[in-house]
From Swiss-Prot:
It comes from Clostridium botulinum (strain Langeland / NCTC 10281 / Type F). InterPro entries: Ribosome_maturation_RimP, RimP_C, RimP_C_sf, RimP_N, RimP_N_sf. This is Ribosome maturation factor RimP. The keyword GTP-binding does not apply. Pfam families: DUF150_C (PF17384), RimP_N (PF02576). One of its GO terms (biological process) is ribosomal small subunit assembly.
Length: 153
């Protein structure tokens, strides 16, 4: 099973568990760091994410993973909030944070810049519009390596 198929399969099975515990499944990733593998599950809610909430989701997901055993190699399971400087992965995430400040990291420079920061104004399947100072800047999505919410307390 490919990594993409694994993640999609896990999303389908973990999403109802998270929702049953009053959390949104924000993102899942399976990564190798050094010699260790990590299955990271990010959850969110309108009221924030507590350590207790992460523990509840972790226990429920751990039971599921023990039952279905989708990953052959050893790994660590981590459940956490996406954090204040969260990566915006989906159109749903972008829609939620319209009007907020974001950071766009680019694969290659546009107008000699590889990083743009500004207010998320709009987006479509091809581009993202941000307000930088008083100007609207349109960045093609294929040029964007990472979109992050600019955390502000």
């Amino acid at each position: 099973m490919s990594k993409h198929s694994l993640i999609e399969n896990l999303k389908e099975q973990i999403e109802p568990i998270a929702e049953g515990l009053d959390y949104e499944l924000y993102h899942i990733e399976f990564v190798k760091e050094g010699k260790e593998n990590y299955l990271r599950i990010y959850i969110d809610s309108e009221n924030g994410v507590s350590l207790e909430g992460c523990e509840k989701v972790s226990r429920a997901v751990s039971e599921l993973l023990d039952d279905i055993d989708p990953i052959q190699e050893s790994y660590y399971l981590e459940v956490s909030s996406p954090g204040i400087d969260r990566v915006l992965y989906t159109d749903k995430h972008l829609e939620k944070y319209k009007g907020y400040n974001i950071v766009l990291n680019l694969y290659s420079a546009i107008d000699k810049k590889k990083k743009y920061e500004g207010e998320l104004v709009d987006f479509n399947e091809n581009e993202i519009d941000i307000k930088v100072e008083e100007n609207i800047v349109t960045i093609p999505r294929e040029k964007i390596s990472k979109t992050t919410l600019k955390g502000e307390l």
